[in-house]
Amino acid sequence: MNGSVGIVETKKVTFPEITLECGEKIAPVTVAYETYGELNERGDNAILILHALTGDAHVAGKHRPEDKVAGWWDPMVGPGRPFDTNKYFIVCSNVLGGCYGTTGPSSINPATGRPWGMSFPIITIRDMVNLQYKLVRHLGITKILAAVGGSMGGMQALEWAYMYPEMLKSVVAIATSARLSPFGIAFNAVGREAIMTDPEWRGGNYYGFEGPKRGLALARMIGIITYKSDISWQYRFGRTHTYETDQELFSHTSRFEIENYLYYQGDKLVKRFDANTYLYLLKAMDLHDISRGRGRYREILKELKTPLLAIGIDTDFLYPTYQQKEIVEALKEAKKEAYYWELSSPHGHDAFLIEFSKMAPILSNFLEYVAGRRATINF
């Protein structure tokens, strides 16, 4: 899919304060972000990409030539790619509460000179969007061509559509929901428990200590199970075992390959993510409900004004396709412009981070339509 954006850098901007839904303020507040492409003179060719739970602002390219891995959606961003940097100005920021440069629980609280820890205020998806709005205005953007996100990123995109419709021309919500299901809340609760019962969590005041490595790893293992599908596990691992002798087989320490993979993923996250951030973002997802404090759920969905593309994944265990379809159905019932496309993939929820070649023409088509470069949508 054509060219890379090459070497990029993460930038930061600090704002005086932000007032949160809970009524508390964070002052000052810093946002880490990356941009790709150029903003046009009218300031209306911007696309906002919104990351998922353990993501960051580094969508595409590399920070150093020797980096082995590019940004998390690299095949989708660059010259000639769906998010074409010859046409669009792409922006992605680390969410409020994050641990990749934006103010979060691991940041220093200026009032104490120590990390916020669990004294950090409770944040919501709406708070994340309000901070992103500050960034968008700071960058001189007058109109966002599309707010695009998968999973927790899709939650942000939907809130953008409700909170700032005058700034937005369209929404692409991928493998997400307009309110987190009880099923999703249940898995989050178990992940939270894994972290908070680790003795090294220390009530969230673990900075300077080892930290809840085992608890965070376990939370990640639980999450990874929900991001895949039965068929993907079958294809990749089956019942392959790591034992070499019968003595090893009949032991509690022997493992199947799938177990090794889960441990690997858990340990991998521990090396790059803050446990308290994980807790705060899970809570923000739990609180996500586009109708909360606004009215009846389906009626609030009908109030969304911007053209919307919802993408579901046929094997998504965590956000089944009915959750995307109900958004589109409500909008169509209200005579709004809404489209649904289903990605067929064995990879489950994670397919939106894997199936680039399948998604590319759909996203390109929709963005070209929204930008006025084509009269119809063909998919």
Curated annotation (Swiss-Prot):
Main location: cytoplasm
Entry GO MF terms: homoserine O-acetyltransferase activity
Gene label: metXA
Biological processes per GO annotation: homoserine metabolic process; methionine biosynthetic process
Family classification: Belongs to the AB hydrolase superfamily. MetX family.
Annotated source species: Carboxydothermus hydrogenoformans (strain ATCC BAA-161 / DSM 6008 / Z-2901)
Single GO cellular component term: cytoplasm
Reaction(s) the record says it catalyses: L-homoserine + acetyl-CoA = O-acetyl-L-homoserine + CoA
Protein name: Homoserine O-acetyltransferase
